[in-house]
Amino acid sequence: MRILHSGTLVASAGGPAMSTYLTLKGLREQGVDAEIIMFPLNNEDKLRGDDVPMHFATSTPKTPLGFAPTYKRDILSLGDYDIYHAQGVWLWNTYALASAARKAGKPYLITPRGMLYPQDIAKSNAFFKKLSLRWRLLDDLNRAACVHVTCKEEMMHCRNLGVTAPIAVIPNPVEIKDYPYKKQDGVRRIGYLGRVSRRKNIEGLIEAFHALGDEAKDAELLIIGSGDKEYESYLRHLVEKYGLSNVRFAGFLSGEEKDEALASCSVLAMPSEFENLGNVVLEVLVRGIPCIATTGNPWEELQSRNCGWWVPYTQLDITNAVRQALQASDATLAEMGRNGRQLMEQRYSVTSIAHQMKSLYEWIAAAAPKPEFVR
């Protein structure tokens, strides 16, 4: 079975690039000929992985909306595929892939990547998105063989927008492996990992450290990531305003630098209002590190499996979660870490997720029964 994905494996794209890469890798390990087409790389671009077949379009995006007139032709020039799979929405390459699949007479899937959450639609280019939804996207979604989402909340948002196509709920995968770096100091360190973006509410952690005062004086907040320069400047100004000497900006890290930085953290926090999954949670739980997330994120398992804190999206609750993380004993955090690692091994491994995705493709190709995760 030949599958062509359209998306990106560029590391700066964050979680979507990582989960797309791991999905491709897992599918190929299970005998599926999965490939990807994406825009050409810039000199500074780093890939999440380069051991899966990649094709590059002949042109780069011409506008902020990603308009690339030759993208559809580039897809069709690659030959025949059984199924086409687009990663993300509001993107020209997704429209092009859906159109190419229909021209080839083949089924296609679309993975929205959390971009159909009402908060995401409202926070940027809302007018364009609503116009695009009515003009083109909803039709593409409803003509898809299936829409793939990562949690039930995302499925609900799709239905509320008028998506009537079958929807498959399959979470993102995480690579199960041993990580050589271990925590080397006794500092109770709260980490943030991800894009530096206003949507991520990183200031919620800075506000928590300010509110805790002496309770956090011996702790540290480590912010790992890059992105919106203006927002980062605002965060640095906030730190300076509060006189916090225990907040550190590490910038974008990858490879061993990232592994070492994460290993130094006692707890990771994802204080954003919403995520369709939040690959950061996968990345830290597999390393045996507990996590804080808000209830706008589909991570009730942090609470039910005792591997972190799942709290309402309010500053008071985020501050209280940070307080509890700072006050927890080493033994408590270690137990939470073991629970998180076990959860990842049981439900989120690359092999497990690739098996589900393969069964979804086989159903679409009329070669297998409808999986139970398709609604």
Regions found by a protein language model. Name each.
Residues 290-294:
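Short hydrophobic beta-strand element within catalytic cores of glycosyltransferases
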